[in-house]
Each structure stands twice: as C-alpha cells, then as structure tokens.
C-alpha cells in the first residue's frame, strides 16, 4: 500500500517538474530567438486595419450597468447550476432536500425582487 502511494507521489512530482522545465525552456527560447526592439517605431504599435489609418480612441468606456448585468448573470447562472445538481439527486434528497431547494430559490428570488425595486436592472436614467 505504501509503495503504491509513494509511486503516485513520484509520478506527480515528475509531472510537476517536467511542466516547470517545459515552461522555463519555452520562455528562454522565446527570449533568445525573439526579435529585439531597439528603436521604437510608432507605426509598429498601431493595429492593422486593412491599410486604413485608425480613427478615434480604441478604448471603449462601457457603462457600469454592463458589469452589473454580467455579475447578475453569473450569479443566476450559478443558481441554475446548483438547481441542476439538486435535480439529479432529488430522489435521494427527499422532502428535506426539496424544502432546502425551495428556501434556496426563495432567497434568490427575493434578491431579484430587491434588485428590481432599487432599479439596478433599469437601463434608462430616472427623470424626477
């Protein structure tokens, strides 16, 4: 039993060491064989746009509402993941698991109602 565990640790250690060696080797080769940039040329830093000189600022300033919507999406997507996992073991969970799922969904739905009430999901500004 101990020999099997020891062999597994050695295999894992060899894997980690070889991964580190491979990373160091790739980084070293790219440093040695890569292009040296001695003179800063402005035209090399511009993105290629089919031969047309770029116009305007390439940085987009997005509203914070986009980030909020993305965070809400991730939260409710995780809710769907948990409900899917719960639905696959619903027979083993029994009534207690059913009540726990109802509590879970009700907490999340109350959070959604709260977000709607404070206006976090509104896209238009408030005109008072």
Curated annotation (Swiss-Prot):
Keywords: Cell membrane, Membrane, NAD, Quinone, Translocase, Transmembrane, Transmembrane helix, Transport, Ubiquinone
Keyword Acetylation: no
Gene3D superfamilies: NADH:ubiquinone/plastoquinone oxidoreductase, chain 3
GO-annotated molecular function: NADH dehydrogenase (ubiquinone) activity; NADH:ubiquinone reductase (non-electrogenic) activity; quinone binding
Topological category with respect to the lipid bilayer: Multi-pass membrane protein
Main location: membrane
UniProt-recorded name of the protein: NADH-quinone oxidoreductase subunit A
The gene coding this protein: nuoA
């Amino acid at each position: 039993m101990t020999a099997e565990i020891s062999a597994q640790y050695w295999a894992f250690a060899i894997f980690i060491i070889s991964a580190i060696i491979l990373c160091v080797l790739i980084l070293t080769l790219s440093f040695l064989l890569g292009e040296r940039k001695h003179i800063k040329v402005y035209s090399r830093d511009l993105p290629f746009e089919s031969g047309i000189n770029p116009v305007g600022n390439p940085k987009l300033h997005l509203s914070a509402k986009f980030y909020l919507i993305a965070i809400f999406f991730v939260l409710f997507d995780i809710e769907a993941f948990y409900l899917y996992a719960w639905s696959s073991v619903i027979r083993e969970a029994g009534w207690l698991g059913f009540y726990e799922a109802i509590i879970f969904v009700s907490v999340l739905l109350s959070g959604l109602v709260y977000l709607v009430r404070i206006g976090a999901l509104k896209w238009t500004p408030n005109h008072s």
